[in-house]
Amino acid sequence: SVSLEQTLGFRIKVTNVLDVVTEGRLYSFNSSNNTLTIQTTKKNQSPQNFKVIKCTFIKHLEVIGDKPSFNSFKKQQIKPSYVNVERVEKLLKESVIASKKKELLRGKGVSAEGQFIFDQIFKTIGDTKWVAKDIIILDDVKVQPPYKVEDIKVLHEGSNQSITLIQRIVERSWEQLEQDDGRKGG
Amino acid sequence: MTTTSTTSVDGRTSSTLKATLSASGPNSNGPTPAVLPQKPKLTGWAQAAAKALPRQQQQQQQARKDDSVAVQPANTKTKTIASTAPPANIKGSSTANGSSTNKKFKRANKQPYNREEVRSYMHKLFQSYTAGEKSHSMKTYKQVLSETASGRVSTATDWGTVSSSKNKNKKYGCLSDIAKVLRNQ
Amino acid sequence: MKGNFRKRDSSTNSRKGGNSDSNYTNGGVPNQNNSSMFYENPEITRNFDDRQDYLLANSIGSDVTVTVTSGVKYTGLLVSCNLESTNGIDVVLRFPRVADSGVSDSVDDLAKTLGETLLIHGEDVAELELKNIDLSLDEKWENSKAQETTPARTNIEKERVNGESNEVTKFRTDVDISGSGREIKERKLEKWTPEEGAEHFDINKGKALEDDSASWDQFAVNEKKFGVKSTFDEHLYTTKINKDDPNYSKRLQEAERIAKEIESQGTSGNIHIAEDRGIIIDDSGLDEEDLYSGVDRRGDELLAALKSNSKPNSNKGNRYVPPTLRQQPHHMDPAIISSSNSNKNENAVSTDTSTPAAAGAPEGKPPQKTSKNKKSLSSKEAQIEELKKFSEKFKVPYDIPKDMLEVLKRSSSTLKSNSSLPPKPISKTPSAKTVSPTTQISAGKSESRRSGSNISQGQSSTGHTTRSSTSLRRRNHGSFFGAKNPHTNDAKRVLFGKSFNMFIKSKEAHDEKKKGDDASENMEPFFIEKPYFTAPTWLNTIEESYKTFFPDEDTAIQEAQTRFQQRQLNSMGNAVPGMNPAMGMNMGGMMGFPMGGPSASPNPMMNGFAAGSMGMYMPFQPQPMFYHPSMPQMMPVMGSNGAEEGGGNISPHVPAGFMAAGPGAPMGAFGYPGGIPFQGMMGSGPSGMPANGSAMHSHGHSRNYHQTSHHGHHNSSTSGHK
Amino acid sequence: MAIKSLESFLFERGLVGSYAIEALNNCTLDIDVNHYVSRLLTNKREQYLDAIGGFPTSLKMYLESDLKIFKDFNITPIFVFNGGLTYNQLEASGHFTAASASASISSTTTSSSGTNATTRSNTESVLLQRSRGWTQWNNLISSNQNSYIDQPIQPQEPFRHNTTIDSKAYQNDLIAYFIEHGYMYQVAPYSSWFQLAYLLNSAYIDAIYGPTDCLMLDCVDRFILGMEFPNKEFRFIDRSRVMKDLGCTHEEFIDIAMAVGNDLQPTTLPPLQIYPVPQLFDIALEMVLNTGTNFYAYQLSTTLQNDSKENIQNYQRGISALRYMPVLKDTGKVELFVQEIVVSEEDSEKNNKDGKKSNLSSPSSASSSASPATTVTKNASEKLTYEKSSTKEVRKPRDIPNDVHDFIGQMLPHEYYFYRSIGLVTGKLFDAIVTGVYPEEPPLGGGSSTSYKKLVSKSVEIFKNKEINLLTQPINRYYQIKQIKQVKWYAANEPTTLTNRMSPSMFETINHLIVKTETSDEKEFSISEFITTINGSSNMAKDFISEKVIFPNSVPIESKLNSPFNLLSTNFLRLLVLLEFFTFDFKEKLLEPTRWGEVFLKLNELNIDSKYHESVIIFLVFLKCDVLKLDEEVQPPAPSALSQATLRSYPEESLYVLLITRVLTLFQVDQKPSNYHGPIDKKTLIFRDHLSFIKENLNELFEAVLISSLTSGEFNRLSLDNFGWARKIVRYLPFKLDSPNTIMAMMWEFFLQKYLHNGNAKNDALSLVATEFNTYKSTPNLDEQFVESHRFLLEISKVMQELNAAKLIDENVFKLFTKAVEFTTTALSS
């Protein structure tokens, strides 16, 4: 039998039970949690992509190409090195804050179309937010599900300017959605 | 008494040393016009010093060098003057001293992976989430599943891959193709 | 070496120690190997776990996608994961959303139920996709921190140095410098050695050139360029000096003198020194794979450079001479005879510093006495000289970035002249006595040909002989050697003792030349050629690789095809003398046999090998087939069919040679009268599919000839009755 | 290696002619030793050789009888050995990985290793069979554990099967034999059969006896394939007749040869690798004739397959090696043997280009080779004659590409090839310099013991670095920079880089040491004479340290080393300095023996028989390396050949037996040639591996020292012709011959065991040895051999005493050994 270490660096093609195929280099095989980690980007690329796959989820694993010449821990070009825990903590905090901001722009439990309409409006008008499942623009205009042109409501009187703009945006967005749909169908 | 001389230390005149230091900018790694002409000189000097030594002495030193295990590796190439950091700094505290040490190390060797520290941090982090589930409006996937329609239909987590395929009961079953290649090399 | 071994030992020990210290358990999974494929020890497990932990720790705070076992994909911010879980990885996502609803539900349905934070247990995590993970964050972070703190430190250092300026004459140890006030363990300096692998090369990536020049590393350069660690350079960084040595000051003076000498050299015209002083070699020729594996493609260039350098060249000045062979006259003559223009008593004096003029002077001139006037150099100077010479001669053509050209104006011109190799002589043999190999070979050939005609063949073979199972043992009468019988010749033996001996042979050649020379007094003494004259490459006549002598795929296939057709043509003509060769081709195309799949008949050739694993070549046994008189009558019809199909001698659709099915051997048998059973062969392509050939069926009295063109463009059939 | 399966094919087709041996009367016959040895040692012979080590004695027997017949017919044989290997051959033999892949394959079972008999290389098969032999043996031992008391078990599974014996291993022994009996020999720079072809073409010889590979050369019209001495016949092959019968052109034949596997391209390429070996050629020929297959095109068309790149590469290298093979020419230079090609004059330029682009060997196939048909149709023949009349044919040598070193190997100086050609060097070091790899392959005993591995790693410092420096210093400076690594079979991925460069160089440190005595040219070198010379000096430093170096050309011949004795003595002294048997300091004018050297210098005083001197040095160096004490068990322990009963009842005596057998691995029993089949002992074999390793390394270090001396010009190289070099120098080189086999050690082992169990009855014990070892045939004078080997033990015992006095060995070991020898004395004199 061969040392497990030697599996490192192999270019492999993994088909999971859902027949989704992942290709890349074997980065790690962990028997302690029964997973396989694949590096899916090219060696010299940065940043890198990885995929951790649970072994029980693998239907089939196939080697592509030859045995790598560098199949040992020592020769990997990614080797664990010092991790500054503070830095990790800091990064985590920053990204949580950033994500929170983004999160506000996502409707909870809304349809994909609704989100698309929101995004399109947000592109043009920065002051757009979700209130429950309604889109509120400039605290003036409301778009309710299912977010068609008919669903645009004015909250306060006398803001016709913005309403026409929003109508046009919503209209165009739906056209685009239908086009995309048609393309999908074909 | 044995004196250790390196390329980074020029002991002939203090003025030279000063020049070197003042010349090196805020980032001592950056080259400045004043540094470059200095460099061959040092190289040449050390080269000559090496030659001036009798051969046997060199060999002895070589031997001694091999026997000794250095407390810390030092990168003699850097222009910064080595300040010896207490071992605690290896753990990566953010004091000025510590970071300068790290910096010095950056070129020579990446610092070794701090396994225990990473593990304990990750452990704490995970604890903080799992212990305070409610505070983050935390839901587990199981809960999510039970709330959806499909959840009521029991979902098998085991896809039967292990029991059905030829890799049954084999710990490294999915790696069989790799094993084949390795054996045929 | 010893040190290395010891180091390795200690490192393994410490690793073992580290292992026992760590309280990390394997999560209850027994670490034993159930299958015979792989084995894994705690060491390996730990290494793998470290790899994954390292990756996961670096993925905290990035967006990830989790595929759960039902196929639904969730994306979100990875805020935590459990490294201790034993069945998959427990993952905590912040702001989860459904990216792909998989098979079953609609997104809306699933999304409704999600909260702000989602914990997915390892057993449900089928896949965890980590995207855009930057593993160099720590390094970058350290750098940015360091930059903030450096100025302050530098000032402190400056002050301290000023305070200690009275110690001018002393060398300062590390302890002195770091301040005697602090208590610090003394430590020894260690040479920085690159790790195995590519790290130390990768570090320079993505940085500006200026950064590199400061941190230029001699070891890295040498190792990168030649795969050699220079022993000399190691002293540069590791020398310790013993101040108490009585000869210390004397040596110091000596050292400074030498140092000055070296410094005064400058970089002009010497790419080596230029490189060593921080001028960068362009790395673009090396891709990461090369750096990674440590294989330097420039090895070839190096070889080429050496090749050109080792070629004796009278224009060259000081040649590099191995230290072993110093104090000897060296000669630039490519001939095996080394010649010198100095007399014997002068040889002792002449050193390898003799001027190019002296070395390259033509034979007729009186010897120049330059070398006598020169003082012999001290050994140290000689050594430096040696090194200088070595580095001067040792040039490797590199690509130089444009902005470097200014700096290297002079050296680049030297490079140019170096990279073009001098034309090479086809034969090095200087001797007039030896016959050129060409004539020898042809002479040998014609001789053996003549003798060949006298041999009575043991067996006359016409066309194809069928294979006989018993070997024919028939003795030949007459002579094995033909007309010219060998006779023992003692001279031959003597000749054998003297030939194949480079010393004797080159001496003979030398003496021969001497005889021919009238002014024999001026003749140089004979010396045996020094072994370092031989380059590591063989003499070539053209500047091309052997690989260029091979055809590409199409040409190779076409060649084989032509050959095959030619053979068929010949065998047809041979077998049916009255027939038109054009018919032969069509017949060749027609004489196929119906063939089922590989399972058609038990196959004698299979011998238990898996069928179809490669292109199987399948012989098979057809039913005995008989020759009918009616066949020739059918010929014209078939011929016209062939013509309709555009089949002249050569079909326009020529399949790959080895894919074609053709009769070859059966055609030979076709010429015999009466019914002769014969064996047919059928080829199959690499795919294991039977080749597309023509088929022939027979039903009682009626015959159908069914011909298919190779590509199935056109089918036609005719039937005839007896 | 020959073209796979071709020979049997030719016999079946009746294409092998035969002649009576008289036909060769008075001729000079060149013999390819590789081919010849493979004929003599067929599969059934010497099946247990790998379990006991040593030289195959039966080879000598066959050789002698053949030589006698040559003499009867006044045939002058010239034996040509194979030299270096080309890249394809190196790869196939596992050179670059020190056969580690093969070694690991041999440890797994055949079925799972994924190779079949067709694709497996010879090295793989050898190791596979060896491990099979030992596995079977272990099973046999354990199953007989209870019944075995003092009757040794005979092995059943052969240790060699269906593999060709590597004649390289016995090259030195054969050369020694040829020199002794006055036969001519030569070692080719690369392929031996090319050297034969060159010699034939330049009319130095009349006929060649070589492998079927010779058919690939169109300059060889006929060659002898085999000799059948019982019938006084020989078998030969006539090229034109074969080609006519096969019905393919010369180019197609070469294509087939490359695909089935031959000496220059040993692997069988797809699609042929799935067929059994005996049918390969037959099938390949059918494919060419019936479907117009071109195997090169086939390789190109299957680029998707895993190995296709390597296959294309191997094919190209094979063809190229055939076109440009270095041979040693009569000028003493090694040059490429380039065959000519025929081109028509007017198309010379064009055809040359076309020819270049062809993988087939000649562009004008119609004229250069037999056409497949005997008669040609009228039209076709007219066409041909028309073509012929319009053009003239020109023969010109092929163009030589600029990267011959990529498929042959880098070039060494002519002088180095010369030393190889006369057998002065084995060439393993040359190969290391050329390839950048010095392989440490698994020894006969497997080499799993830690002490052996330790020895391998220690050899880098003690031997290898010095050798590499000595050999790379005098030659092109590329080699001084080139990385040369020691690759070990057990850790092929962790090579040790050898140091080429030292300052001062190794040669500079020793070249002031000169032994120059006033002796005649004829004085023979021996270690004993050397000791006498050294001991004859009252002041070593004065007599053997020369103020001036003697290598420069300016030094007159008289002041150089002028006799073979002085040459060898000088270099032997240098060897001993490098081995630290002497300390030497030129500046201090110091030269004196170390404690080891003192023991060595006493060998004459102690009356040690001069024929054992070499063995004693090996023994001393082994002890000095200090990897295994003489009484120490190897780790992991190997099963003892003694029975459990013996080990349990006689623990003390068992230890004696261990010491005795170990020392006796240095003693070669005087055997009559025979195929050995008798008891085997792995434990002893493993110890023999250690000593054999030391010997090989001593040989290589001495070679390196000698070469550095010769190339620098310290010796008058013009004073000898080839026979002189052989008779006066090569013949007396120490450490050249293969180490003794383990037979004598085992004879003593089983003799003493029987003696112990049988109430100390010597005669029963001796007769047991006689029957078990079949000595009535192989060792008629068994008693004499026991007495002789006992004398050897006593002599070693004297050396041990000196070593003990000098505190160079453990006192316990010394006492134990003394007791052990006493034990043998009582047993033998009882």
UniProtKB/Swiss-Prot annotation, chain B:
Taxonomy, superkingdom: Eukaryota
Region (Disordered): 1-116, 147-168
Gene: PBP4
Subcellular localization(s) per the UniProt record: Cytoplasm; Nucleus
Bias (Low complexity): 1-24, 46-62
Keyword set, alphabetical order: Cytoplasm, Nucleus
Protein name: Protein PBP4
Subunit structure: Interacts with IGO1, LSM12 and PBP1.
Keyword Nucleus: yes
Other remarks in the entry: Present with 1560 molecules/cell in log phase SD medium.
Nucleus as UniProt keyword: yes
Polar residues composition-biased segments: 73-83, 91-102, 147-166
One cellular-component annotation, GO: cytoplasm
From Swiss-Prot, chain C:
GO cellular component, one term: ribosome
Chain spans, region Disordered: 1-38, 305-380, 412-488, 683-722
Classification lineage: Eukaryota, Fungi, Dikarya, Ascomycota, Saccharomycotina
Covalent cross-link site, Glycyl lysine isopeptide (Lys-Gly) (interchain with G-Cter in ubiquitin): K344
Record field: compositional bias (Basic residues): 698-722
Protein name in UniProt: PAB1-binding protein 1
InterPro entries: ATXN2-like (IPR045117), LsmAD_domain (IPR009604), Sm (IPR047575), SM_dom_ATX (IPR025852)
Ranges of Basic and acidic residues composition bias in the record: 1-10
Species assigned in the record: Saccharomyces cerevisiae (strain ATCC 204508 / S288c)
Curated annotation (Swiss-Prot), chain D:
Region annotated Disordered, chain positions: 347-400
Gene Ontology biological process terms from the UniProt entry: DNA damage response; positive regulation of translation; regulation of mating type switching; regulation of translation
Superkingdom per UniProt: Eukaryota
Modified sites of kind Phosphoserine: S358, S362, S371
Pfam families named among the record's database cross-references: MKT1_C, MKT1_N, XPG_N
UniProt keyword annotations, A-Z: Cytoplasm, Isopeptide bond, Phosphoprotein, Translation regulation, Ubl conjugation
SMART domains associated with the record: XPGI, XPGN
Glycyl lysine isopeptide (Lys-Gly) (interchain with G-Cter in ubiquitin) crosslink site(s): K4
Molecular functions per Gene Ontology: DNA endonuclease activity; mRNA 3'-UTR binding
Effect of D30G: In strain: 2574, ATCC 24657 / D273-10B, ATCC 200060 / W303, Sigma 1278B, YJM 1129, YJM 270, YJM 627 and YJM 789
Gene Ontology CC terms, in alphabetical order: cytoplasm; cytoplasmic stress granule; cytosol; nuclear periphery; P-body; ribosome
Record's compositionally biased regions (Basic and acidic residues): 380-400
Subunit structure, interactors included: Interacts (via C-terminus) with PBP1 (via C-terminus).
Name under which the protein is recorded: Post-transcriptional regulator MKT1
Species, as recorded: Saccharomyces cerevisiae (strain ATCC 204508 / S288c)
Gene name of this polypeptide: MKT1
